[in-house]
């Protein structure tokens, strides 16, 4: 297997499409470990039934020091005594989170929110009247396609605000659509603590940041146009049905009146 520093994986020399991601391996002292299928020459899946063996490899700084030095713009001398974790995880952000207890922040329409995993919310800074954005309330707004939340947001109250999807006919004027990452990506350390896992779990894969910027998404680029179109069609059908009913009632009354005069 070749060590691909840029893709963070092992690639079989004779079969380049066969790769093993470092992120799929377990972190152990001085390296990584994984179960290896001798038949598939890869990490076994759920239906594998061939012979397996436990493999342990050194860290990437040991396997390819020159490649790691080039990737992280360090000299080989500067690379000495550093671990994969030192290079792959922002150490300033890590120390701010662990040593100083600083919560990550995210900017939403010019206002700063704290990513508070313990309270299960994005908590607005210096705004005690706002209840902020509670993750449990926006669970159904997570987009698998975007791999992020896309929610209706009220910039005045600085809160998530649910829409009435059964009756909405136009884009809301006082609300905007904002997009931001899943809470594990916003604060992986807080996520690990809350789940009872090692605080360094998945940090090399996810990365670590102290601040994020939420994106504002035009309503026309969300799922809302489809819902509005469907509601307008339903409204049109109801209107037509009502007109037909009124016409039928009117005709019936006219017919009854005509019969009365004949009598």
Predicted stretch roles:
Residues 3, 115-119, 151, 240-263:
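Non-Sec secretion/translocation targeting segments of pathogen effectors
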Residues 42, 48-98:
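Charged, compositionally biased non-catalytic regions
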Residues 13-16, 48-50, 55, 98, ...:
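Classical N-terminal secretory signal peptides
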Residues 68-69, 236-244:
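Long, compositionally biased, charged low-complexity segments
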Residues 2-5, 77-136:
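Long, contiguous regulatory modules within eukaryotic nuclear regulatory proteins
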């Amino acid at each position: 297997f070749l060590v691909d520093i840029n893709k963070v994986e092992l690639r079989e020399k004779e079969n380049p499409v066969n790769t093993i991601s470092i992120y799929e391996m377990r972190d152990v002292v001085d390296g990584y470990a994984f179960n290896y299928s001798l038949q598939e020459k890869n990490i076994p899946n759920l239906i594998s039934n061939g012979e397996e063996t436990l493999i342990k490899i050194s860290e990437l700084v040991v396997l390819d020091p020159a490649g790691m030095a080039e990737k992280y713009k360090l000299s080989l001398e500067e690379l000495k005594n550093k671990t994969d974790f030192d290079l792959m995880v922002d150490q300033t952000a890590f120390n701010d989170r662990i040593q100083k207890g600083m919560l990550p922040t995210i900017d939403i329409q010019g206002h700063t929110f704290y990513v508070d995993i313990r309270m299960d919310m994005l908590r607005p800074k210096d705004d005690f009247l706002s209840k902020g954005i509670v993750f449990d309330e926006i669970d159904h707004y997570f987009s698998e396609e975007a791999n992020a939340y896309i929610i209706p947001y009220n910039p005045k109250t600085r809160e998530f605000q649910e829409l009435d999807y059964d009756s909405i006919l136009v884009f809301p004027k006082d609300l905007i659509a904002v997009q931001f990452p899943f809470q594990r990506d916003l604060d992986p350390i807080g996520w690990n603590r809350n789940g009872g896992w090692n605080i360094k779990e998945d940090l090399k894969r996810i990365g670590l940041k102290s601040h994020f910027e939420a994106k504002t998404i035009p309503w026309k680029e969300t799922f809302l146009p489809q819902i509005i179109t469907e509601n307008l069609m339903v409204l049109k059908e109801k209107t037509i049905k009502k007109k037909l009913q009124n016409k039928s009632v009117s005709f019936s009354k006219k017919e009854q009146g005509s019969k009365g005069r004949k009598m």
